[in-house]
Amino acid sequence: MLDSPLLSKIIEKPTALSVLKSVFGYQSFRKGQEEVINAALNGQDALVVMATGNGKSLCYQIPALCFDGLTLVISPLISLMKDQVDQLQANGIEADFLNSSQTLEQQQQVQNKLISGQLKLLYVSPEKVMTNSFFQLISYSKVCFIAIDEAHCISQWGHDFRPEYTQLGGLKASFPDAPIMALTATADYATQQDILRHLNLKNLHKYIGSFDRPNIRYTLEEKYKPMEQLTRFVLAQKGKSGIIYCNSRNKVERIAESLRNKGVSAAAYHAGMETAIRERVQQDFQRDNVQVVVATIAFGMGINKSNVRFVAHFDLPRSIESYYQETGRAGRDDLPAEAVLFYEPADYAWLQKILLEKPETPQRQIEQHKLEAIGEFAESQTCRRLVLLNYFGEHRQTPCNNCDICLDPPKKYDGLVDAQKVMSTIYRVGQCFGAHYVIAVLRGMHNQKIIERQHHKLSVYGIGKDKSKEHWQSVIRQLIHLGFVQQVISELNPTLQLTESAKVILKGEEPLELAMPRISAISKIAHNPQRQGVANYDKDLFARLRFLRKQIADKENIPPYIVFNDATLQEMAQYMPTSNIEMLQINGVGSIKLERFGQPFMALIQEHKAILANAQNND
């Protein structure tokens, strides 16, 4: 780690603002940060709910540098600890971690740092922090502050409940003079109350920030030919970093292989792989050696890669919290990012079937509530951002103009006759076939199974041949959403059945408006590019700065975003700083990073400016 006398000077009499500027390289606080930091410095416990990408980590890292003593950071994931420690060390901060991934020799080195008082921050797992051996070790240090990251893990209402978190309620008794800060990006009201109850927080400062991530565009793509749709979307990203989530290991492997066959740098990641292989995939992704990771939900929590430009869900997540957290791994640098959910009603029905196979317990009721909420989100015809925010108790009325519903509002038509055709066909084939078969009968397809079952002789055979398969898929989905048709998952295949509500439609007793099938929502993305994070930056210089960053990162054996993130490089490409004073005005460039990395970037910028000047003179 860099042992710089400059850092000692910076933190000799630190204030929150001086640490923010000198160590982390930012000129001002983001909304909520300063009040949370001041609460900690005043000795208050705090509950902080702050969206990913809004600077949650700084809320405890800055007080840690202001306090005279050790800060404990309790974190659930080994890879997350290492990633955060790497970033702190890049800023010249004495930080380290203790966990099961280390050798005995490595653990002893950390323990020696603790005993000698070298460390400002120590990251540790929840299962380790409450052990007698850890208390004995920590007795050599003055613990002045405790941060509990991913605090939603303490709550059974949370989407990622971890039993080991429940023992953290004893921290307040063990360290009565140390303020405790519990932080999370995903906690509804019930989860927030659970966190407070378990942790016994006193003299509380509560900050519930906005859950909005305005730089992320939310899009739902109805599945027609899902693998083709996904491939088209990934290829349109033109080499940008992204994560694709699936619900099964087999699907992860198949999609990764299919993308590689299309020329995409893609890797699979799931719990069935050897640990060493998973670690290699994660490292390759962090270091921009792999473009796309196709993963189960196990991937992503352990990294803070800032330049993930898209997250795609090939399957429906089990809760809005999971969806929000997973999509939140995109755009952490505040630059535009895409979140695409590929969906069909069978996805929801399948998750419902799995859930109902569990014993009937209070936990199953919680999971049912969360599953229904994500189903409502997927089927909504209103602004997706408003649905998301409303779930977390943040009520807004103004549509976002940055989701598929806002960019391409559904167009309505009189759908009564179409609905009657679909329902009649479902009824005539015995309510024991799925959507594909019903559509084949509707469209009069010459299908061997249809002929074997004599369904080509039905009165409904071919009554929908004037419209496309995609049209009828859309009609069936909407009838499911509206409750006129239900999809029943059996051990064999999903089947369509009529509900009691279908009678009024079949009899024509009520009007029915349906939405016209939309062209691919993904194609709308291509025609509605998002705003760029920094206006008027030199794109050629930005590309050269990224290449230089990759060279430095590989040499230092760290991920590129730990050197400087994309937003910082865009500012450099706009303002073109060539002196230390100018460089320190760039967000994300602190004194330590300037000392460690600044010179080659300024040299490259100087060279680029000379090239531009020569070109202008020649004109």
Curated annotation (Swiss-Prot):
Its cofactor is Mg(2+); Zn(2+). Residues 37-205 form the Helicase ATP-binding domain. Zn(2+) binds at C383, C400, C403, C406. It is an enzyme of class 5 (isomerase). Residues 229-374 form the Helicase C-terminal domain. Requires Mg(2+) for helicase activity. It holds the Pfam family HRDC. Transmembrane segments: none annotated. Disulfide bonds: none annotated. InterPro entries: DEAD/DEAH_box_helicase_dom, DNA_helicase_ATP-dep_RecQ, DNA_helicase_ATP-dep_RecQ_bac, Helicase_ATP-bd, Helicase_C-like, HRDC-like_sf, HRDC_dom, HRDC_dom_sf. It catalyses: Couples ATP hydrolysis with the unwinding of duplex DNA by translocating in the 3'-5' direction; ATP + H2O = ADP + phosphate + H(+). Residues 535-615 form the HRDC domain. A motif (DEAH box) lies at residues 149-152. Belongs to the helicase family. RecQ subfamily. An ATP-dependent DNA helicase which unwinds DNA in a 3'-5' direction. Plays a role in recombination. This is ATP-dependent DNA helicase RecQ. It comes from Haemophilus influenzae (strain ATCC 51907 / DSM 11121 / KW20 / Rd). The gene is recQ.
